[in-house]
Amino acid sequence: MELDNTTKENIEKMIGENDVFLFMKGNPDFPMCGFSSVASAILKKCGVEFGHCNVLDDESIREGIKAYSNWPTIPQLYIKKEFVGGCDIMKEMAESGELIELFNTRGIKTEIS
């Protein structure tokens, strides 16, 4: 799918207004897929505040975010407007301590130091 300007602007607005942002299926309280559930649980465990977008509510965002990041799957994590990765990368980074380190180096408050 080609990324139209309106969708690109909407994506950039969402990730620009939140230091940590997760594109997911469902929402943090009611994820609609296992990968989105794991991704939001990781962020909750880290104790970071994060924005989110339920891509199931908007086809243009669901397809557009894949074109924007050049990444084929959802969920997708952005930190300070930078694409970090999906569920598997988040799991690896959380287990190794890299995710907390990334939050700390970017000045994002966590409940884990």
Residue ranges and their predicted role:
Residues 4-8, 58-62, 96:
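Structural motif corresponding to alpha-helix initiation and N-cap regions
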Residues 44-63, 72:
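Thiol-based oxidoreductase modules, predominantly thioredoxin-like and allied folds used
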Residues 23-25, 56-58, 80:
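Structured beta-strand/turn binding interfaces of compact recognition modules in eukaryotic regulators
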Residues 63-74, 111-112:
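Short Fe-S-cluster ligation motifs
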Residues 79-111:
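Non-catalytic, surface beta->alpha helical segment in thiol-disulfide oxidoreductase systems
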Residues 11-49:
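Local sequence-structure signature of Cys/Sec-based thiol-disulfide redox active-site neighborhoods
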Residues 37, 41-45, 59, 83-84, ...:
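Mobile acidic interaction elements
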Residues 1-21, 111-112:
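N-terminal leader/targeting and pre-domain segments
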